[in-house]
Amino acid sequence: MSRRKVCRFTVEGVKEIDYKDVNKLKAYINETGKIVPSRVTGTSAKYQRQLATAIKRARFLALLPYCDRHFN
């Protein structure tokens, strides 16, 4: 039996996830560029939605890559 993961954003008391904070967003993207699901990270549903929106905004503004091919 594994322990339930805790949402980092809830513990830190974050109101809204900033799309310009690329270092924090990179922790929620796997090596192929996909958004890591909340069952893996332990993020709550509220913050997972905000996280997905922030990552998509950062991708649109070319702050984050869409896929792993952009690293070459």
UniProtKB/Swiss-Prot annotation:
Gene from which this protein is expressed: rpsR
Role, per record: Binds as a heterodimer with protein bS6 to the central domain of the 16S rRNA, where it helps stabilize the platform of the 30S subunit.
HAMAP family attached to this UniProt entry: Ribosomal_bS18
rRNA-binding listed as a keyword: yes
Entry protein name: Small ribosomal subunit protein bS18
Alphabetic keyword roster: Ribonucleoprotein, Ribosomal protein, RNA-binding, rRNA-binding
Subunit structure: Part of the 30S ribosomal subunit. Forms a tight heterodimer with protein bS6.
Molecular function GO labels: small ribosomal subunit rRNA binding; structural constituent of ribosome
Domain of life assignment: Bacteria
Keyword presence, rRNA-binding: yes
Annotated family: Belongs to the bacterial ribosomal protein bS18 family.
PANTHER family, alphabetized: 30S RIBOSOMAL PROTEIN S18 (PTHR13479), SMALL RIBOSOMAL SUBUNIT PROTEIN BS18M (PTHR13479:SF40)
A Gene Ontology term for the protein's cellular component: cytosolic small ribosomal subunit
One example of a Gene Ontology biological process annotation: translation
InterPro entries (alphabetical): Ribosomal_bS18, Ribosomal_bS18_CS, Ribosomal_bS18_sf
